[in-house]
């Protein structure tokens, strides 16, 4: 194996841009920014979305577009003899 061809694998702090929560993880990503985390200074990477702010993980996920499309379809074709699963 060749020496010194792999990037440095080090501890990095990822910061959620919308909530400000910090996550410590190992990564090869580089950054000039630094931040303090639990008394130590680490390179900082700002993220737009993390598990702290993503709707899937926060439980604030909305299905309005899909639900609206299904309701619109059911209303449009209600008179054609199609039955809903609830009617069976």
From Swiss-Prot:
Kindly list the biological process annotations in GO that this record carries.
translation
What GO molecular functions are on record for this protein? structural constituent of ribosome
Annotated keywords:
Ribonucleoprotein, Ribosomal protein
- Give a single Pfam family match: Ribosomal_L31
Q: Where is the signal peptide?
A: none
Q: Which PANTHER family match?
A: 50S RIBOSOMAL PROTEIN L31, CHLOROPLASTIC, LARGE RIBOSOMAL SUBUNIT PROTEIN BL31C
User: Which NCBIfam families does this chain map to?
Assistant: L31, PRK01678.1
Protein known as:
Large ribosomal subunit protein bL31B
């Amino acid at each position: 194996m060749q020496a010194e061809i792999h990037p440095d694998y080090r501890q990095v702090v990822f910061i959620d841009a919308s909530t400000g929560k910090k996550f410590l993880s190992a990564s090869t990503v580089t950054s000039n920014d630094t931040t303090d985390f639990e008394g130590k200074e680490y390179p900082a990477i700002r993220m737009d979305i993390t598990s702290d702010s993503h709707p899937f993980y926060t439980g604030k996920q909305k299905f309005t577009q899909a639900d609206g499309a299904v309701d619109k379809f059911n209303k449009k074709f209600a008179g054609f003899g199609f039955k809903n699963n609830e009617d069976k």
